[in-house]
């Protein structure tokens, strides 16, 4: 059991792909890719799942400020990448140093 949000997202994506490979793909190399994407997993881990607990999981007005601050400097290379690609790299390659701060209801509960 793991409470790490990033790890939970990667586990969900991997499980979804595994399920697709063994049930829907059925050996067809051209089968429609019907598995959880990074964008889907991010939504479910934030706003989608947060809706169960009230106004959390989003940076919209009137929502609680719950946030994880990530630093991808250790993963940087000389390629300019859009934020979605940078987040995907963090998701799959993060280390403990990637998380630099955590906020719960606006209060910093962890800072590296």
Q: Model-found features: residue ranges?
A:
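C-terminal cap of metal-dependent C-N hydrolases
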Residues: 64-112
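His/Asp/Glu-enriched, well-ordered alpha-helical/loop segment
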Residues: 1-76, 91
């Amino acid at each position: 059991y793991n409470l790490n949000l990033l790890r939970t997202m990667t586990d969900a994506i991997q499980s979804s792909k595994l399920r697709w490979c063994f049930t829907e793909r059925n050996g067809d190399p051209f089968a429609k890719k019907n598995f959880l994407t990074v964008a889907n997993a991010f939504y479910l881990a934030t706003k989608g799942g947060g809706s169960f607990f009230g106004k959390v999981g989003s940076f919209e007005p009137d929502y609680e400020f719950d946030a994880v601050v990530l630093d991808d400097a250790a993963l940087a290379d000389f390629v300019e990448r859009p934020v979605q690609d940078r987040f995907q790299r963090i998701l799959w390659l993060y280390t403990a140093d990637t998380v630099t701060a955590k906020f719960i209801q606006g209060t910093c509960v962890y800072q590296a």
